């Protein structure tokens, strides 16, 4: 249901999972993402914290908490924590994605691109990882590669939920490669 964009149905389904399994990290993180999308930041934070308490060593729970905490916290502390976690799990897609997000907030595009590339290398069908890699390539003035990854992000978004606006990607693709319109 989440893949089809049925957010309210997805929310109910994940809440049912939590009734059976109160510490299900995947359900907690999914509910955090849903709450974030619905503009309920306190609920999202609560779910991320519950996921981390339920499974402190889970890379996705760690990344979700660090990714959102990094917007408010000292970026140097967040970067140090992410790098420490990555030293033990260098191929972790969510940790690399969180590090890329931290770098992008600081306009450190070359470093962001590398972190996003690491996420895509480990989980190449994640539309958000592909999209953020495309954005970083776009900022690094690599229009051909950016366009390629924007297209891959759109293809992946047809199969999995994505946090980006598909219409904006289509518009950006037309700006990058006007001759390749469908």
For each predicted feature, which ranges?
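TPR alpha-solenoid repeat register
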Residues: 27, 61, 95, 129, ...
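Structural marker of alpha-solenoid helical repeat scaffolds
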Residues: 20, 54-55, 87-89, 122-123, ...
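Canonical tetratricopeptide repeat
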Residues: 30, 64-67, 98, 132, ...
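Short, highly charged
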Residues: 1-54, 59-60, 64
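Terminal, low-structured helical/coil segments at or just beyond the last alpha-helical repeat
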Residues: 84, 136-182
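Structural signature of tandem alpha-helical TPR/SEL1-like repeats
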Residues: 4-13, 37-50, 71-84, 106-118, ...
């Amino acid at each position: 249901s989440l893949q089809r964009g049925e957010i309210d149905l997805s929310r109910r389904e994940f809440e049912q999972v939590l009734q059976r399994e109160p510490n299900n990290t995947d359900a907690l993180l999914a509910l955090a993402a849903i709450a974030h999308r619905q503009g309920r930041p306190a609920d999202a934070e609560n779910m991320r914290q519950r996921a981390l308490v339920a499974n402190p060593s889970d890379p996705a729970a760690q990344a979700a908490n660090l990714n959102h905490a990094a917007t408010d916290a000292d970026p140097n502390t967040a970067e140090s924590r992410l790098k420490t976690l990555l030293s033990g799990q260098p191929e972790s897609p969510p940790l690399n994605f969180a590090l890329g997000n931290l770098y992008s907030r600081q306009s450190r595009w070359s470093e962001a691109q590398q972190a996003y590339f690491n996420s895509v290398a480990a989980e190449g069908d994640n539309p958000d990882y592909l999209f953020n890699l495309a954005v970083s390539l776009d900022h690094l003035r690599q229009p051909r590669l950016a366009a390629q990854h924007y297209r891959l992000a759109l293809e992946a978004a047809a199969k999995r939920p994505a946090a980006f606006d598909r219409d904006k990607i289509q518009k950006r693709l037309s700006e990058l490669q006007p001759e390749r319109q469908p």
